[in-house]
């Protein structure tokens, strides 16, 4: 498995970055709204750190050996955004038809916080998508593909991605994860799935931000 050291560092940093705000809240009970400032800075700095570590991966994984041009990567990212939004609409509609709730506790909580502290949206629109693509697509999917095959690696990566969100909509997040794996595989550039992920989150967040 290529780039084991960098991959391990990315995974460790990711867990530290995501755990840090909770650890601080548990240790300092009087942080109040400052925790959202801390979390925003934490995610943005964390994204930069993970990008730096990923850039040290000198040997491309099998998915990255024949990358498309940057123009094609951009177009694939835009197409992926449309596909993931349409796919979400279809899955949520089917969920409703089956009599299950389509409400997302995760999304509702994030939007509620963002309405009070708009700067927090930077963490969700930029920091989180960049880190998640590096962890779930580049590291997990990219490194497992030679061992389990691309389909097996995509399924494993997407299951982890869905569990990480702990939202109750397992199939929805697994679908999103699989689509981002597909974009990464099609282009050989992790930036493609990053773009689609950032735009997907932005479509949800911007109406709330602009309507504030």
Where are these regions (language model features)?
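Alpha-helical transmembrane spans of integral membrane proteins, capturing the lipid-embedded, hydrophobic core
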Residues: 11-19, 40-48, 77-85, 89, ...
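Non-cytosolic membrane-interface motifs at loop->transmembrane helix junctions
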Residues: 32-40, 104-110, 178, 182
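Alpha-helical transmembrane segments of polytopic integral membrane proteins
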Residues: 21, 47-54, 87-91, 132, ...
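Transmembrane helix-loop junctions in multipass membrane proteins, especially transporters and channels
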Residues: 26, 30-31, 55-62, 92, ...
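Alpha-helical transmembrane segments in multi-pass membrane proteins
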Residues: 3-57
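Juxtamembrane helix-loop-helix connectors linking adjacent transmembrane helices
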Residues: 31, 61-128, 146
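Structural signal for the C-terminal ends of transmembrane alpha-helices
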Residues: 51-61, 183-187
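Transmembrane helix-loop-helix hairpins at the membrane interface
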Residues: 116-212
């Amino acid at each position: 498995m290529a780039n084991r050291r960098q991959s391990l560092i990315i995974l460790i940093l990711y867990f530290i970055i995501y755990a840090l705000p909770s650890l601080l809240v548990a240790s300092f009970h009087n942080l109040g709204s400052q925790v959202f400032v801390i979390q925003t800075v934490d995610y943005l700095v964390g994204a930069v750190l993970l990008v730096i570590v990923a850039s040290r991966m000198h040997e491309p994984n099998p998915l990255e050996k024949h990358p498309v041009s940057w123009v094609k990567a951009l177009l694939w990212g835009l197409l992926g955004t449309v596909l993931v939004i349409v796919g979400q609409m279809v899955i949520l509609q089917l969920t409703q038809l089956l009599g299950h709730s389509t409400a997302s506790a995760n999304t509702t909580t994030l939007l509620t916080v963002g309405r009070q502290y708009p700067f927090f949206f930077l963490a969700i629109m930029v920091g989180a998508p960049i880190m998640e693509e590096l962890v779930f697509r580049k590291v997990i999917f990219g490194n497992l593909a030679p061992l389990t095959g691309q389909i097996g690696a995509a399924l494993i990566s997407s299951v982890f991605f869905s569990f990480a969100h702990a939202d109750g909509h397992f199939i929805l997040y697994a679908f999103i994860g699989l689509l981002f794996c597909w974009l990464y595989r099609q282009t050989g550039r992790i930036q493609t799935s990053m773009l689609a992920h950032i735009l997907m989150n932005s479509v949800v967040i911007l109406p709330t931000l602009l309507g504030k």
